[in-house]
Regions:
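Sequence/structural signature of beta-propeller domains
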Residues: 1-298
Length: 298
């Protein structure tokens, strides 16, 4: 079977995350909380060892590692820094985590685990760095002086003068040696080639006269490299961005104009797509679509 996790973006310690558990036939067999008492949990990311990293989207937000079976209490990850977290993506080959920041002048961060605990990353003490991109697109990584600042100290995004800034970092995903992420302020999808330390834009709405995809937000990537992008605004769609850069709508929500698409995820077999309408018609709704429309992916 498999488990679908979903955050709760409620403020004032009313947020958290929950899980839907499915058996091998794809039948829903359980639903339960995996995190509570946190604030504005926007997005996050799965780990290769089957936990969920839930991110607080507040000025000095934190990340919590959650047991997706709901049996163990969530654990704070101070090594991932205090800032307006959006989402995370784990690169298992290099013991690294990449993180987006939802600020108009946000940064792209990289955490390197210096120790392992039972084949898992230690998120308590490691190296947190910020990306600095040159004019040609090559990336340097600069250590942050103070990854866990207090409210009266300089925020992480302003600590390194050479840091590059991104207009509203959103979803992020690791796939085949690359990091894919979105920025909502300029409606762009980016691709970072890890081995080449090279960053490029693979989708830019402003270059198109009638863009199919706007309001870019959460993303996931199928096993064959298609990028699924959920819209916050736009036409409330999930749009598939293929290897050639062509954008094709996959599904659209109608009659829920005050909501946003969130949390796209594909089942391990590749025959089910899950996503949520954050506010629906008043309360959040999670959907499942069945069909062999993709080859699959995490």
């Amino acid at each position: 079977g498999w488990i679908y996790t979903s955050n709760s973006e409620v403020g004032n310690r009313g947020g958290g995350a929950g899980a839907l558990r499915f058996n091998a036939e794809g039948e829903l067999i359980d639903a339960y909380p995996i995190l509570s008492g946190t604030t504005d949990n926007c997005a996050g990311g799965a780990t290769p060892w089957s936990t969920w990293l839930s991110c607080e989207e507040t000025a000095y937000g934190q990340v919590y590692e959650c047991d997706v079976y709901g049996k163990r209490s969530a654990v704070l990850c101070p090594g991932l820094g205090y800032f307006k977290h959006e989402a995370v993506a784990v690169d298992p080959s290099w013991r690294r985590v990449y993180l987006t920041e939802d600020e108009k002048d946000g940064c792209l961060y990289r955490y390197t685990a210096l120790e392992m605990m039972d084949d898992r990353f230690d998120f308590h003490s490691g190296l947190l760095e910020v990306a600095s991109v040159d004019d040609e697109g090559y990336v340097s990584w600069i250590p942050l002086p103070n990854p866990t600042p207090k409210s009266y100290q300089s925020p992480t995004r302003l600590q390194v003068p050479r840091a590059s800034h991104f207009n509203g970092g959103e979803g992020i995903w690791y796939h085949a040696g690359r990091i894919i992420f979105s920025t909502k302020g300029d409606n762009r999808i980016w691709e970072y080639d890890i081995s080449k330390n090279f960053l490029r834009v693979i989708y830019d709405a402003k270059t198109l006269s009638r863009p199919v995809l706007t309001g870019v937000d959460n993303i996931c990537v199928s096993s064959d490299g298609n990028v699924l992008v959920a819209e916050d605004g736009g036409d409330l769609q999930i749009v598939v961005l293929g290897p050639t850069g062509r954008a094709v709508p996959l599904v659209q929500i109608v009659g829920q104009d005050d909501s946003e698409m969130a949390g796209p995820a594909i089942s391990p077999r590749g025959d089910k797509l899950y996503f949520s309408s954050q506010r629906g018609n008043g309360n959040g709704i999670t959907y499942e679509i069945s069909g062999r429309f993709l080859k699959g992916g995490r």
